[in-house]
Curated annotation (Swiss-Prot):
Misc note: The active site cysteines correspond to the redox-active cysteines of peroxiredoxins.
Cellular compartments per GO CC: cytoplasm; extracellular region
MF terms in GO: antioxidant activity
Family membership noted in the UniProt record: Belongs to the peroxiredoxin-like PRXL2 family. PRXL2A subfamily.
Region (Thioredoxin fold): 3-101
InterPro entries with a match to the protein in the record: PXL2A/B/C (IPR032801), Thioredoxin-like_sf (IPR036249)
Provenance organism: Bos taurus (Bovine)
CDD domains: PRX_like2
Pfam families: AhpC-TSA_2
Alphabetic keyword roster: Antioxidant, Cytoplasm, Redox-active center, Secreted
Described purpose of this protein according to its UniProt entry: Involved in redox regulation of the cell. Acts as an antioxidant. Inhibits TNFSF11-induced NFKB1 and JUN activation and osteoclast differentiation. May affect bone resorption and help to maintain bone mass. Acts as a negative regulator of macrophage-mediated inflammation by inhibiting macrophage production of inflammatory cytokines, probably through suppression of the MAPK signaling pathway.
Protein name: Peroxiredoxin-like 2A
Coiled coil ranges: none
Amino acid sequence: MGMWSIGAGAIGVAALALLLANTDMFLAKPEKAALEYLEDIDLKTLEKDAVTFKAKALWEKNGAVIMAVRRPGCFLCREEATDLSSLKPKLDELGVPLYAVVKEHIKNEVKDFQPYFKGEIFLDENKKFYGPQRRKMMFMGFVRLGVWQNFFRAWNGGFSGNLDGEGFILGGVFVMGPGKQGILLEHREKEFGDKVNLTSVLEAARKIRPQTSASEKQ
């Protein structure tokens, strides 16, 4: 009787832990980024003679859609990159560029990611686009039903990947307006494979008002 009671209690505790892991109760809440914070981020180009520049250069004239990639080798990230790239023709019509930032540049990870993403990619080695408060999903992610649904969705879509690089710091997607128009959309990944809504991305991109130079006004 005693062993049965202990066993039943252990099962109950495990069931409760599994239930709680599938709520948002213990997920780190994202801190909204200020425009000034994003503008001041240092980014690098990925060629051998890397050039460092401020992130605001990406959107100061025409706005931009920017993906902060959790890990280029992740098949879930490759799926989202493909989804965002499907918007490229419509973004081109709007004159809005599509970019991505990665937090590390190792092996051929970015090169192998490029076929999935139809925009330029830059290095954010200080991981600022993943802040101001960096959020991590550790092994709890593997007991979340939503994560497994995302896994199966990407697998069924034919996506594959690898385990190279840091993959616990969660990423996101931003739609930036030019100049001081500000952040028009900020999607913070809450769990592995939590993709941005593509309709919301396009709606935000359509709100972008390109900057006109003084010569164009005359």
